[in-house]
Design a protein with these regions (language model features):
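Unchanged
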Residues: 1-176
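Left-handed beta-helix
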Residues: 105-106, 110-269
């Protein structure tokens, strides 16, 4: 990841920003980055890392943060440790990196160049760049628990999922289909923006039904039943089919009498 940024650093030079935001693309959450940016500027950090609290028993799959006594300076950064450090005062919790970073531009450039010259480096932000800046005392943490998003509720506040595995990707979709979803797509004060082709509304014909499900635009549920599923746009489900606990990608055609349970169906099949 560090090498990918370095290879494209000419784009950053062209814009010449004072700070650079680097956010991971395989996570699901709702956040106001400006609040993190304000803290970054106020603390004069070389890098600010957004972090979330997770049970210590689950933290070994992530980059773990150990804080100094001031509660904001990062004392040590451990990439996927066998024994994750506990938060002060919370022995069962660990702060993990969300994969969201704000760098001072000059600090980032210097760190990337030094890392590129190290033949033993894996050229990874979490494995190499963050430990380097932590050792220099330049790394601060931003606690995601303090982020306030308009329209959020106690149920969905602080939601974050890493969807880097198939199981996690599936589970994140299932989070959307309960009566009171823990990730709320219906927050009109802070909508999740997307880009869809121009399609008509979803259509239900021949007593087709969808229960506790999301059905995308242009999809047709014809004489079939869909339960606890996410149906993307431009999907057709033929009569007498039964879909349960399934994620269906765009452009899928499901024939009559088909039964699909607890699956992910790839696009255009």
């Amino acid at each position: 990841s560090a090498d990918a940024i370095l290879q494209n650093f000419n784009l950053i030079h062209d814009e010449n920003p004072k700070d650079v935001l680097v956010f991971g693309a395989d996570h699901v959450y709702r956040m106001d980055p400006m609040q993190m940016f304000q803290q970054h500027r106020e603390t004069n950090a070389g890098i600010t890392i957004a972090a979330i609290r997770v049970p210590r028993s689950e933290a070994s799959e992530f980059g773990c943060i150990e804080l100094a006594e001031d509660g904001i300076t990062i004392k040590a950064f451990h990439e996927k440790p066998a024994n994750p450090p506990a938060m002060p005062g919370h022995p069962d919790l660990t702060l993990i990196s969300m994969g969201n970073y704000i760098f001072k531009r000059d600090v980032m450039e210097e760190a990337l160049i030094l890392d590129s010259e190290n033949l033993e480096s894996r050229h990874d932000i979490g494995g190499n760049i963050i430990p380097m800046l932590t050792a220099q005392g330049q790394a601060k943490v931003y606690d995601f628990a303090n982020n306030v998003v308009p329209g959020e509720t106690p149920r969905d506040k602080g939601y974050w999922r890493d969807v880097g595995s198939i199981d996690a990707y599936y589970d994140a979709h299932m989070d959307l289909v309960s009566v009171h979803p823990i990730f709320n797509l219906y927050n009109r004060e802070w909508p999740v923006l997307t880009n869809l082709p121009p399609l008509p509304p979803a259509k239900f014909s021949e007593n087709g039904t969808a229960v506790d499900s999301i059905v995308g635009a242009g999809s047709i549920i014809a004489g079939s039943r869909v339960e606890r599923s996410v149906v993307s746009f431009d999907v057709q489900v033929q009569p007498s089919a039964l879909i349960q606990g399934t994620v269906i990608m765009p452009g899928v055609r499901i024939g009559s009498n088909v039964i699909i349970r607890n699956a992910i169906v790839d696009k255009n099949v």
